[in-house]
Amino acid sequence: MLMPKRTKFRKQMKGRNRGYATRGASLSTGEFALKAVEAGRVNSRQIEAARQALTRHVKRQAKIWIRVFPDKPLTKKPLQTRMGKGKAGVEEWVMNIKPGRILFEMAGVSEELAREALTLAMHKLPFKSKFVTRESENEIY
């Protein structure tokens, strides 16, 4: 499970996920990438499921970079609990994803194999995303 080693505060406010990604919106090291088209939240289980789908499909031939990390605690009250009595405990760790954010990068394989693998990973995520290459990364969403 991906989560921070330590944080300054145990709990955070929910916040709002608006606008487009400015940071993490361009390829840094890989040739091919998975780019978010919609806004959403991704948790550590979804990141791990997508990573496993990628590595199993390319049979460890490619170099894969994970460009997202869940650093926001999400709290949830137990079932059948009355309102009040303070904020609940941390249930899971998530990351807010804005449109345009690069999620995974890949290098060292052909474009067809990378497209197949990143499409498998795409289906593990709770929002729409698309396959991009170095040439096509600056296209409008």
From Swiss-Prot:
Belongs to the universal ribosomal protein uL16 family. The gene is rplP. This is Large ribosomal subunit protein uL16. Binds 23S rRNA and is also seen to make contacts with the A and possibly P site tRNAs. NCBIfam families: rplP_bact. Residues 1-22 are annotated as: Disordered. GO terms for cellular component: cytosolic large ribosomal subunit. GO terms for molecular function: rRNA binding; structural constituent of ribosome; tRNA binding. InterPro entries: Ribosomal_uL16, Ribosomal_uL16_bact-type, Ribosomal_uL16_CS, Ribosomal_uL16_dom, Ribosomal_uL16_sf. It comes from Campylobacter curvus (strain 525.92). The lineage of its organism: Bacteria, Pseudomonadati, Campylobacterota, Epsilonproteobacteria, Campylobacterales. GO terms for biological process: translation. Residues 1-17 have a biased composition (Basic residues). Part of the 50S ribosomal subunit. Keywords: Ribonucleoprotein, Ribosomal protein, RNA-binding, rRNA-binding, tRNA-binding. It holds the Pfam family Ribosomal_L16.
